[in-house]
UniProtKB/Swiss-Prot annotation:
PANTHER family: NADH DEHYDROGENASE [UBIQUINONE] IRON-SULFUR PROTEIN 2, MITOCHONDRIAL, NADH-UBIQUINONE OXIDOREDUCTASE 49 KDA SUBUNIT. It is a peripheral membrane protein. NDH-1 is composed of 14 different subunits. Subunits NuoB, C, D, E, F, and G constitute the peripheral sector of the complex. This is NADH-quinone oxidoreductase subunit D.
Amino acid sequence: MAEIKNYTLNFGPQHPAAHGVLRLVLELDGEVIQRADPHIGLLHRGTEKLAESKTFIQSLPYMDRLDYVSMMCNEHAYCLAIEKLMGIQVPERAQYIRVMFSEITRLLNHLLWLGCHGMDCGAMNMLIYCFREREDLFDMYEAVSGARMHAAYFRPGGVYRDLPDVMPQYKVSKIRNAKAMARLNENRQGSLLDFIDDFTKRFPTLVDEYETLLTDNRIWKQRTVGIGVLTPERALNLGLTGAMIRGSGIAWDLRKTQPYDVYDRMDFDIPVGVNGDTYDRYLVRVEEMRQSNRIIEQCSAWLRANPGPVITDNHKVAPPSRVEMKTSMEELIHHFKLFTEGFHVPEGEAYAAVEHPKGEFGIYAISDGANKPYRLKIRAPGFAHLAALDEMSRGHMIADAVAIIGTMDIVFGEIDR
């Protein structure tokens, strides 16, 4: 009798559910996955090596381009590492702004994940619902930094500038008349904090809408319940973090276990799963969105009541204000030197990690006393998660591989670096 051979299938990198440039070599027995071999490196840009030839401040925009869905969270870890090396104290107001925008970034990430994960499994309408809310969040990014995605807003020692008193408004154009503009500008009449407060009031109801569409949906449950199960022990041994480990029932969240900035003052809960399957990870991330909304509300209330500086007064790191720079020759020279030569970081090494939307995102920086890092190592959560794909997908159907890739929430900017 002829020997039965397994069938090898190439999944991606052009596949619409590959989430970027994932190439999977699947070994199949009929339609059942026997082995999954992920091939990475198709988006490698040498970020860690590039950082060695750039000053510390010049490397900051590269961080936005790692996980290009969670921009400010990447910047946060990078700034924390430099601050740890230099012993810089960040003003309280800047810490609250950072925490607020880290949570806005978490919402941006989770909304894209929910829309794409739903669409991968056949719920086409989820993407439209989620992008409706992402538009408002991008407007918050644009108001503080001028960019909708790659913000480069955080700085070692604080943030680039304070929150604006006026929210940018839509203008009448060829494609939008005055009536449509008036409707879009209704909640943009005040400051950025007014706009954020309006969003946080509406958002819990909008999350309820998403849950109405998916949580008790019979087809959604058939696609996710019992798929990609990970026991707490295996999740720990595989080095998983974020929603991947919390979905398996382990309440590990750096915002609680190793709080940074002002997270120790925030009142929020850590959602955890029970079964460790794709459905539990979905529930964990949806509840995380509600908790992020709570944190944003608390930050907004504090920021209203407490004006103050938003960047350190250590002038070795912080540039002079625009007014000072345009009235004093010394300040102009200081500004020029700071942005051409950069600042020198004392010899040493530091590791800083943040609770990124995808897990523990860490920056390990080594300084030799120069104005550039001697070595910069990026700890990407998605890298460890992708390594677990083989174990999670064995014994499942090809169609389930799409649900498992979706539940990992992988982005190749950070994996390939």
